Amino acid sequence: MLEKLMEEGMNIARLNFSHGTYEYHSKTIQNLRLAIHNYSKKIGYMYPLAIALDTKGPEIRTGVLDGGLTEVELIMGNTVTLTIDPKYAENVTAQMIYVDYPNIVNVMKKGDRVYVDDGLMSLLVQNTTHSTLECTIENGGKLGSHKGINLPGVPVDLPAVSEKDKSDLVFGVEQNVDMVFASFIRNGDALREIRDILGEQGKHILVISKIECQQGLKNLDEIIDASDGIMAARGDMGIEIPVHKVFVAQKIIFSHCTKAGKPSICATQMLESMTYKPRPTRAEVTDVGNAVLDGADCVMLSGESAKGAYPLECVRTMANTCLEAEAAIWQRQLFDDLRYNTPCPVDPSHSIAIAAVEASLKSRAVAIIVITTSGRSAHLISRYKPRCPILAVTRRPVVARQLNLWRSVIPIQYIMPPAQDWMKDMDARVQFAITYGKGMGFIKPGSALIAVSGWKEGAGCTNTLRVLYASPHEIY
């Protein structure tokens, strides 16, 4: 199944650490790497699938259902008790629900609302004691284990990084994950704490901040500056702020990321109906397409592929919709706007990135080939949203995997050892990208190409741009 998902277009695998044990996640990572190995052998080149660790974050969640049940029903109008007593942590019933936030009994008062499971169920607080909240069920539903709880408008004093998060981050470093999706980020200080925990051994790991609360939106620019990327996590966001404002918040997040040159991810309920049905609603397909038009670099599936009955169909539908949406963007106007708003002066690599996109538009190039070590040149070119794919050739596996976050970038891991003649080695890597593009079908003999690289060995920056034309035969 994992190999089939990669074939359909999956390029980042997200592990949700709100659920599962370390043994479970370790086994999943082993399975992913085995699938990557097998799929790479099948297609004849290294498939750079990235692995992301999604932290639980400073969330509030319910306990485990009693007796191994998968769900219990909360009936509208009934009374239910929320308790902080640990003895109910694994004995949750429809009448008594454990909550893992001890201070909830102090911050809540009569008349406040508690939202459960992304707002599917709502409870109205009637009375508080030193260890419980007596509530009336306003909107019922089926409750499972470890479901999220939101307290909109109520200031909570949760730590930026919980003890579980710290342990999970250390586990992620040991497992050599490529990126961390940090939940419920409220300010830039949380990012600095996460990087301290990752330490020297995990300094290569990208930290993507999930914006899902009012404080996160208020401090958006501060968080963008401190992050490697941003995720618009619309599930909790739609509870923390009025649901009719979520689409505006999404557009603000993506536009700020585009301006800052940071990758952005759109997540939550994108193809929710496909969890149980083989075809999406028209509104869901429109949502995916509009996320791309809004400027998102990535779109993400969660429950649809994690527990759904049609994971392959979900990935296929999402990939096809993204292709259609990308073709509908007015690339020239977008590029001109982005270039106009770039402050001057910029460094040589940045100048070359702008020139490469301009040259690709003027020459009608079918691809921009970037020879990169750190991936920064590909990031910069992606920032200006070219009309053609960016083939980023690198020898570093972690760079290839992480480049999946950036829009238009197709990472290619080059595994051949360096040639003694640096210029021949450079040309061989460019030819490798051309051969890849021919195999994918978007490079034809005679196609115009833009090649971006350094001008000599050890240059340390990208400062050379060439316009090439694909040969009908392979040179190397």
Task: List PLM regions with ranges.
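Non-catalytic helical/linker scaffolds that mediate oligomerization, partner binding
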Residues: M1-Y476
